[in-house]
From Swiss-Prot:
One of its GO terms (molecular function) is 1-(5-phosphoribosyl)-5-[(5-phosphoribosylamino)methylideneamino]imidazole-4-carboxamide isomerase activity. HAMAP family: HisA. It comes from Acidiphilium cryptum (strain JF-5). Keywords: Amino-acid biosynthesis, Cytoplasm, Histidine biosynthesis, Isomerase. It catalyses: 1-(5-phospho-beta-D-ribosyl)-5-[(5-phospho-beta-D-ribosylamino)methylideneamino]imidazole-4-carboxamide = 5-[(5-phospho-1-deoxy-D-ribulos-1-ylimino)methylamino]-1-(5-phospho-beta-D-ribosyl)imidazole-4-carboxamide. Its EC number is 5.3.1.16. The active site is at D10, D131. It is an enzyme of class 5 (isomerase). InterPro entries: Aldolase_TIM (IPR013785), His_biosynth (IPR006062), HisA_bact_arch (IPR006063), Isoase_HisA-like (IPR044524), Isoase_HisA-like_bact (IPR023016), RibuloseP-bd_barrel (IPR011060). This is 1-(5-phosphoribosyl)-5-[(5-phosphoribosylamino)methylideneamino] imidazole-4-carboxamide isomerase. GO terms for cellular component: cytoplasm.
Amino acid sequence: MALTLYPAIDLKDGACVRLRRGEMDQATVYAEDPAAQARTFEAAGFTALHVVDLNGAFAGRPVNGEAVRAILTAVAMPVQLGGGIRDMAGIAAWIELGISRVILGSAAVKNPALVREAAAAFPGRIIVGIDARDGMVATEGWAETSSLPATEMAMRLQDAGIAAIIHTDIARDGMLQGLNLDATEALAAAIAIPVIASGGVAGIEDIRNLRAAAARTPNLAGTIIGRALYDGRIDPQAALAEAAAC
């Protein structure tokens, strides 16, 4: 089965940025107009978009709503959104506005009942982001690290009814060091839920390696690509062709 590639738009103060290891003071601005960037990704052939409200992740509430709404207006492809979404009202509001899938991160750790409630209310629309630092789950925009192993959290979510898990290796995020495929594949092998790899994609080889891993672990469903696209290290057409190869 083909992998899904999700170009990433991370929003900080209304602009499209990339961070290094989630550090807000290590932000590089790549586009002042996130909606235009979303259109560029869609025109390149991508079929889904990953958007994170970085300010929202730290504030615990949506902050870049205007930019998200502009993205939704600009593109027809499905958009998944995370960052600062912490309750049913927020989830429902974004889905009503046209968000395809809502990503719960800190809320999933601190309020597991919310995940089950949301997944029951919005089947196929809820994703959980498991962000790991040295194998342990991090929350609050990665500012806090828990004592909960990422794989254990994934196993707890096995029967929650969610659509997918995004597994991010914080140490590699934005660093162009390659996916931590060992950790991601181990997590995926422990569950049946589709798993999306994130953090560190540096080149076409990462997609090739992920495809090989998916042959062994079929619920590896795709990957999120950020800095490598913005820096021109990955050609979109080549990446999409590699992801679709059997």
